[in-house]
Every structure is written in C-alpha cells, then in structure tokens.
C-alpha cells in the first residue's frame, strides 16, 4: 500500500486551482459556442426554434450571476425542475446549456496545462498517437496475431455522483467550482440524464455532452491509472534488485531447457512464470486486455479488476462484465466490428526432384466483419426500414428539397461504406445500400405523390450517382494526380481510413 501511495503521488496530477473568475467572463461562453460550431457535433438548444447564439442573453446571465440571490437559489433549490427561477422553458435550457459548456471549458484548463508542461516533451506526441482512435485497427491487426487469450471488458457504469466529485477533489482545491459541479450533477440526474438511468453512458444529452465527457474521462483515467500500476507491478522488469532479476533470467533459461527435454509436461507452465506480453485497448465503454499468458493468469487479472472497482470506486460490478476467451476460438465486437483471429489452412505443393508432397501451413488472420443485424436495427430505429429490413419512406424529410433528401441519404450511405472500408467482407454493405436507396426513392415519391417506379425512371442516373461514390472513388480522387491505384478486386482489400473522428448511432450499434 505504501508503494502504491508513492507511485500515486509521483504520477498523479498536481493539485490545481481552477480560475473561478473565468466563469464571470463573457468571452468564455462565446469561446464555448464557437468550439461547438467548429467541432464534429453541433450543440443544439432544445425547445428553441432559433438555434443561433445570443450574446444579449449571455450578458443577461452575467448580470444575474453578479446578483447575490442567483447563487443562493442554486444552493437552496438545487432540485428544481427549472433553472434560475425562470418560468420560460427556453431561458431555463439556454442558461443551463451555456453555463455547463462554459464550466466545462474552465475545468479542462488545468488538464491541458499539465500536458503542455510535461517534462518529457519528446514522448508526448508518441503517447497521443498511441491513444488515438486512428491507430486502434492497425494495432489490433498487427499485435493480435501473436496473442493467446482475450479479456473483453465492459467498464462498469453508472458511478455514484459523490465518487465523481471525490476523484476531482484529489486534483483541485477550488471549493466554489466543486459546489457548482455538484449542482450541475444533481440538476441533470433529476432529469434522468447520463448517470442514473441511461442504458448507455455515452448516450448523453446533446446540450451538455462536453461537461459529461469530461466527467466520464476523469473516471476512466482514474481506473486506467490503477490498472497501469497493477501492470507495472506484475512485470519482472520492475524488480529493483538486480540479483533477483538475474536469478529470474537464469531460472527462465533452465525452464526453457527443461521444456525441450519434456515438451508435453512443460509446454503450458513456461508462460506462467515468464513476463507476459499484455496489450490494452479501450474506446468508450469497452476495453480489451489481451496477452500471451495462461488462462490462470487471465483469471487472476479478472479478480484484480473486480476488486479494483469494488474497493477503489465503491462500485460492485458483476464478474460477467469481463469475458475470458481463447483468442483463436472467440469473436468479439469492438468499434462497430465483429472481429476474430481465425486459423486458415494453406496447402502448398512442393516439388523436390521426382518427389512431390503437400505442406499444410496454418496462418492467422485478423478478420473483421460488418454486423448485419445491429445495423439493420439502427436503420429501423431511424425509420429507414422495418425491423426485418424492408425499406420504408421517411415522412419527416418530405418537407425538404429534393437535393437535400438525396444529399442526406447519400451521405449516410457513404459514411457507412467509408467506416467499414476495413471489413474483409463487404457484401453486407450492398444490402444496406439497397435499403437506403429504396427508402430515398419512397421518400421522394411520397413527397411528389408518385410511384417509386415512375420516380426512379424520371431521376435516372442522377439518382444512382449519389449512392455509388464509394471508398474506391474517394480514395482515387485523393491520389489522382500523384499515384495510380488499381482497385480491381477491391472487395478483398482492406483500407483503414484515418479521418473517422467520431462514430454516430448508425455505424456504432453494438455499444
């Protein structure tokens, strides 16, 4: 325990003071608004027809914040269904949104300063690249071919509000900011937002995603901090005694020599004593822990993780959230893909003089497939088809222009093909394209009060062009003037596109 506390003090964030007066500056909220517009997800105000940013309303909020009764109402009436004593639903939602966005901007400042002031400046870009979503699939494709066991982890949720505040209290000393954060959490938990009753922690309210992401990332970073400590303590490379380390190497060499003499008896024991090769990958609420160790070692890690959540976060999690499987015989879903590492047999005919014989070679391949049923379920949820995959019209889009309808359907289709470009089998994507294409035709026919057949004949090739700009054409346009690419047989080629910054509900149905 003393060793852990010393490690914790060395690697954790230093305590920071939040710049609390920034909450009273108008430019903070303007900056938060501009950040939302330039980001991948637009921040919308629920209940308002005009979704433009209003500097006048921000100035009114600043005036009310300087009044003494404003903060008294927040403390004495934190469980009100409306904010700031306003009867108007628009004012309540607008002020709630800009306060949470501005607060999220302020609380992120100490964490950004820590990354900039890190003494190991040369290692920062490498660390960020490893944590990027862009590197996940190439990493899995390169490393998982040499591993044996896989632990598929579902990070437990929801976490109690007080635990979230305690995690932040370790790093900050600004009491007013913590009180304001407590108010936001109590206010939105009463609205059944992301912490208390949502099925998934990532289905956040649109107007407060930035703040909730910050809180969730704080929780996950704390959990991974403990996991990193356990990983380093389990490695023999962390031993401080050089004599013990040399003895471990000599003992391992003796075991290898003994294993050559008695291979049947010693094959499974050798990897339990030697330092296991472990890899950890996480995105959103799912994580993968893979290694070359034995099944007994993986069961011990499962016990460590369950007790970690129980004693460090006061959170009881079911052991069923951690699935242990042999990598060669299991299929796991991650980032919207069904992935596996099957063993394929390859027969090679060898000719030596007058004799010929066949060599059976076993090869591993990282296989990724498109999940058909969940994707059709997502399309049905978005009202593009029925639950069985039969295309239907989209009545809510009939008020749009023909070009906007074509553009929306075409964009969804291109995004699906773009994201699943790394799939080893793409026949499923053509079924999704058929659903979207016929749904688009039914929507246009319903708008113009015509039949689908007549409308498709009238549109002709213009209608088809919106649905045939696939990944091969996009990729060839990017390199048209520099390099020639032949995309014949592209159904067997895999190209991982690295510009996917987020995954919407249609391409991430499994989480």
Curated annotation (Swiss-Prot):
Its main location: plastid. One of its GO terms (cellular component) is plastid. One of its GO terms (molecular function) is RNA binding. InterPro entries: Domain_X, Maturase_MatK, Maturase_MatK_N. The keyword 4Fe-4S does not apply. GO terms for biological process: mRNA processing; RNA splicing; tRNA processing. Pfam families: Intron_maturas2 (PF01348), MatK_N (PF01824). Keywords: Chloroplast, mRNA processing, Plastid, RNA-binding, tRNA processing. The keyword RNA-binding applies. It is found in: Plastid, Chloroplast. Belongs to the intron maturase 2 family. MatK subfamily. Usually encoded in the trnK tRNA gene intron. Probably assists in splicing its own and other chloroplast group II introns. This is Maturase K.
């Amino acid at each position: 325990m003393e060793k852990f506390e010393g490690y914790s003090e060395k690697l954790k964030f230093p305590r920071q003071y939040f710049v609390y007066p920034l909450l009273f500056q108008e430019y903070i909220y303007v900056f938060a608004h501009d950040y939302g517009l330039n980001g991948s997800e637009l921040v919308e105000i629920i209940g308002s027809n005009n979704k433009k940013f209003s500097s006048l309303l921000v100035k009114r909020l600043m005036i009310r914040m300087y009044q003494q009764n404003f903060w008294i109402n927040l403390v004495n009436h934190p469980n009100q269904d409306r904010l700031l004593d306003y009867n108007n639903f628009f004012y309540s939602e607008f002020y709630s949104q800009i306060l949470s966005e501005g607060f999220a901007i302020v609380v992120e400042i100490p964490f950004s300063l820590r990354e900039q002031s890190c003494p190991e400046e040369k290692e920062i870009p490498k660390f960020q690249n490893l944590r990027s979503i862009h590197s996940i699939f190439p990493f899995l494709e390169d490393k998982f071919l040499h591993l044996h066991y896989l632990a598929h982890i579902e990070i437990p949720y929801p976490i109690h509000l007080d635990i979230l505040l305690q995690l932040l209290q370790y790093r900050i000393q600004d009491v007013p900011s913590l009180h304001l954060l407590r108010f936001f959490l109590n206010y939105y938990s009463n609205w059944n937002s992301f912490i208390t009753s949502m099925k998934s922690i990532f289905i956040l309210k649109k107007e407060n995603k930035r703040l909730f992401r910050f809180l969730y990332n704080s929780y996950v970073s704390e959990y991974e901090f403990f996991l990193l400590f356990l990983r380093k303590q389990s490695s023999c490379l962390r031993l401080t005694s050089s004599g013990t380390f040399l003895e471990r190497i000599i003992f391992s060499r003796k075991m290898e020599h003994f294993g050559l003499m008695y291979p049947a008896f010693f094959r499974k024991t050798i990897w339990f004593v030697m330092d296991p090769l472990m890899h950890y990958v996480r995105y959103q609420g799912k994580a993968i822990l893979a290694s070359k160790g034995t099944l007994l070692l993986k069961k011990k890690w499962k016990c460590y993780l369950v007790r970690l959540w129980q004693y460090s976060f006061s959170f009881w999690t079911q052991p069923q959230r951690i699935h242990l499987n042999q990598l060669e015989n299991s299929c796991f879903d991650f980032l919207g893909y069904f992935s596996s590492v099957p063993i394929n047999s390859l027969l090679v005919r060898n000719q030596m003089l007058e004799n010929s014989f066949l060599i059976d070679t076993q090869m591993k391949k990282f296989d990724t497939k498109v999940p058909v049923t969940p994707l059709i379920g997502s399309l049905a949820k978005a009202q593009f088809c029925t639950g069985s995959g039969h295309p239907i019209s989209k009545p809510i889009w009939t008020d749009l222009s023909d070009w906007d309808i074509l553009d929306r359907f075409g964009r969804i289709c291109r995004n699906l093909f773009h994201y699943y470009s790394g799939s080893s089998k793409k026949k499923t994507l053509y079924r999704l394209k058929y659903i979207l294409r016929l749904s688009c035709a039914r929507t246009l026919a319903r708008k113009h009060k015509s039949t689908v057949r007549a409308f498709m004949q009238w549109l002709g090739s213009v209608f088809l062009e919106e649905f045939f700009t696939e990944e091969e054409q996009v990729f060839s346009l990017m390199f048209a003037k520099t390099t020639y690419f032949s995309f014949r047989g592209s159904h067997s080629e895999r190209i991982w596109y690295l510009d996917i910054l987020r995954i919407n509900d249609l391409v991430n149905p499994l989480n």
